[in-house]
């Protein structure tokens, strides 16, 4: 085989990767253009919890001349990525799937769907539940001599980080179930360390949310529920000891058969 023939598969993979990246960027660009046409409406939706907490007649500000423009660009870009998500996953799947086994293909698709579901639930929880109470707490420091004047850039950065944080936190059941599937944790381990997990949840809620007991409880309770869901997932999909023993037995049988086959020719010669 010539050197050019050896390089051709690698070159083909690079060409396919380039084409799929180009299509992904085009999809994001189309989503960005569509989102930019509704930039003000999208920003109004994002700031709705804050405006509701501030009261009627209140407005946000921008402290630099290009701040509003760049804020709208960022909102449109984030929305464009969300709109292009189906295309991005499709291109990623079509590039990766040929190298996966059939069992792995069956496992990947449900994981992707569940990860998107949990992320959306977490972000929605932060937007609809935590944001209103958190903003009311922060705005409570206003007085006759102090007035809150949040800027567009500041709010976009804060809201984006918080929504991403809530989305990733709600991936907890999926992560622990995957770890149980790999044999890294067990149901007994999760049950035994439940009290430490609860302590971590309340500590994390105190750090992430405003120093308000109600808001901290509202953040910690869903995490406790997610932890219990993780235990159920680990029990159903976790790695079983019986399966490990069966796999070890099968491997030993295969090795025994192989050693028998290797010794048979020598016995025939004797």
Curated annotation (Swiss-Prot):
Keywords: Cell inner membrane, Cell membrane, Membrane, Protein transport, Translocation, Transmembrane, Transmembrane helix, Transport
Residue ranges, annotated region (Disordered): 243-270
InterPro entries in alphabetical order: TatC
Quaternary assembly: The Tat system comprises two distinct complexes: a TatABC complex, containing multiple copies of TatA, TatB and TatC subunits, and a separate TatA complex, containing only TatA subunits. Substrates initially bind to the TatABC complex, which probably triggers association of the separate TatA complex to form the active translocon.
GO cellular component annotations of the record: TAT protein transport complex
GO biological process: intracellular protein transmembrane transport; protein transport by the Tat complex
Gene: tatC
Biological source species: Desulforapulum autotrophicum (strain ATCC 43914 / DSM 3382 / VKM B-1955 / HRM2) (Desulfobacterium autotrophicum)
Transmembrane annotation, as ranges: 25-45, 75-95, 111-131, 156-176, 195-211, 213-233
Matches recorded under Pfam families: TatC
GO molecular function: proton motive force dependent protein transmembrane transporter activity
Recorded topology in the membrane: Multi-pass membrane protein
Role according to the record: Part of the twin-arginine translocation (Tat) system that transports large folded proteins containing a characteristic twin-arginine motif in their signal peptide across membranes. Together with TatB, TatC is part of a receptor directly interacting with Tat signal peptides.
Family: Belongs to the TatC family.
Name of the protein this chain belongs to: Sec-independent protein translocase protein TatC
Keyword Protein transport: yes
Annotated localization: Cell inner membrane
